[in-house]
Amino acid sequence: MASSFQLYKALLFFSSLLSAVQAQKVGTQQAEVHPGLTWQTCTSSGSCTTVNGEVTIDANWRWLHTVNGYTNCYTGNEWDTSICTSNEVCAEQCAVDGANYASTYGITTSGSSLRLNFVTQSQQKNIGSRVYLMDDEDTYTMFYLLNKEFTFDVDVSELPCGLNGAVYFVSMDADGGKSRYATNEAGAKYGTGYCDSQCPRDLKFINGVANVEGWESSDTNPNGGVGNHGSCCAEMDIWEANSISTAFTPHPCDTPGQTLCTGDSCGGTYSNDRYGGTCDPDGCDFNSYRQGNKTFYGPGLTVDTNSPVTVVTQFLTDDNTDTGTLSEIKRFYVQNGVVIPNSESTYPANPGNSITTEFCESQKELFGDVDVFSAHGGMAGMGAALEQGMVLVLSLWDDNYSNMLWLDSNYPTDADPTQPGIARGTCPTDSGVPSEVEAQYPNAYVVYSNIKFGPIGSTFGNGGGSGPTTTVTTSTATSTTSSATSTATGQAQHWEQCGGNGWTGPTVCASPWACTVVNSWYSQCL
């Protein structure tokens, strides 16, 4: 017994040495200094507190070189297989380094504002970027979204067809997987641990080791490729948009947190079997144009993309508590002092202006889409991820797989655009080719600013973004700001609008809810 125990201890010791050697290393050629970004947390009383945050760029964009030198381990879209002979050896031999955010990646911040440039030319040409909000130098900020709302300003006026300025949440580890995977020495500080509902296989490192084995360089992306492994987790797309179209989309997974997948069993964009994985790659999307309203979002339209807009997303629960079950995802916009409720779907068979179980089920049926949303947990599955906490991602990208046509054009391109769900925007079906977009619009950019987070009704009536600066107050029965209260009939239900300048709908809330004045333009049943 004693000798067996000694052997066991020796094996453990050897294993720990091996892990220490075969690790995802950190380089020393460039100091890592995260750009600062302020944001705010708000309370139900209407007060907001500024948080001095920072952002880090994803490890996939970083210089990857030999630990003790300057030789690239990865150049263009190819690994140096003389260095990276296996996933484990590559982790031992190669290091990710610090980033020069402005000159290399076109990432700049000022106060609460973050600007991401599309094409940045330095020693190499950089395309787009993906950054994460940090709690401190080594930890991502975790957002717990149930029974809360998330608000930010965005300027998409310089984003043409084929680009996507995306704001979303994913179920990454707060430390980037550093504590869970002993071979990950870089951690969140260097942007490790990414995952999403596509189970991306284009990541150079997953779970602390490289993804070199089975790597196939892309024919269309000079910087990317696909390896044997992917990284899966739940994803909540708050905002995927350019100046033409926008969508918000929950994507649940069987397991909310980050997991490893292999080959086509990953499913999603990067695999031959799109629905073969443990996540929902399609999600349940709300795109106003796809839902039949062709005049709601775009240049000069109701939500005018020629100007910045405040985007408000609410995550409602069945019992109005932080521990309840996710029941509805609502959207509002604020522009030029006016609160704009999300557009209503024009399809009688698929009504509504928010995401609910009923909306998603009827949409899948009407559009003829495969209902993988329900298969992977639906709203309850998404709620499980929101409850565990998610990391905020802010990005700008183009699409080497479908040219972003799923967002802003007719898709599939060979389908009848008069059929429900096919038309998603006004972009031509031959638009969005990355090489063309990069050549024609190198100066494209997106600006995100004024991020706020707090209880329902707390973030967009208190000077947030381009919205009004009035204070949130509560009325016992009806809104005192609407000039049309005497002509309104019926009752507004929980969370619905019940007043505001120019409002002509119901101003009395169903019991026991009270009409709450969020600002002079908008009151809500809370």
UniProtKB/Swiss-Prot annotation:
**Record field: catalytic activity:** Hydrolysis of (1->4)-beta-D-glucosidic linkages in cellulose and cellotetraose, releasing cellobiose from the non-reducing ends of the chains
What are the residue boundaries of the CBM1 domain, all occurrences included?
490-526
Tell me the active site: 235, 240
Q: What's the chief localization of this chain? A: secreted
- Keyword set includes Hydrolase: yes
Which Pfam family, giving just one, matches this sequence? CBM_1
UniProt-listed GO biological process terms: cellulose catabolic process; glucan catabolic process
Q: Which InterPro entries match?
A: CBD_sf, Cellulose-bd_dom_fun, ConA-like_dom_sf, Glyco_hydro_7, Glyco_hydro_7_sf
Disulfide bond sites: 498-515, 509-525
Region Ser/Thr-rich linker: start and end of each range? Answer: 459-490
Subcellular location, record wording = Secreted
Q: Does the keyword Cell membrane apply?
A: no
EC identifiers of the protein: 3.2.1.91
- Which SMART domains does this chain map to? fCBD
Q: From start to end residue, where is composition biased (Low complexity)?
A: 468-488
Extract the SUPFAM superfamilies matched here. Cellulose-binding domain, Concanavalin A-like lectins/glucanases
| Record field: transmembrane | none
Q: Could you say which residues form the signal peptide?
A: 1-23
Q: Which residues are glycosylated?
A: 293, 400
Q: Which family does it belong to?
A: Belongs to the glycosyl hydrolase 7 (cellulase C) family.
Please explain the role this protein plays, according to its UniProt record. The biological conversion of cellulose to glucose generally requires three types of hydrolytic enzymes: (1) Endoglucanases which cut internal beta-1,4-glucosidic bonds; (2) Exocellobiohydrolases that cut the disaccharide cellobiose from the non-reducing end of the cellulose polymer chain; (3) Beta-1,4-glucosidases which hydrolyze the cellobiose and other short cello-oligosaccharides to glucose.
- What is the protein name given in its UniProt record? 1,4-beta-D-glucan cellobiohydrolase B
UniProt lineage: Eukaryota, Fungi, Dikarya, Ascomycota, Pezizomycotina
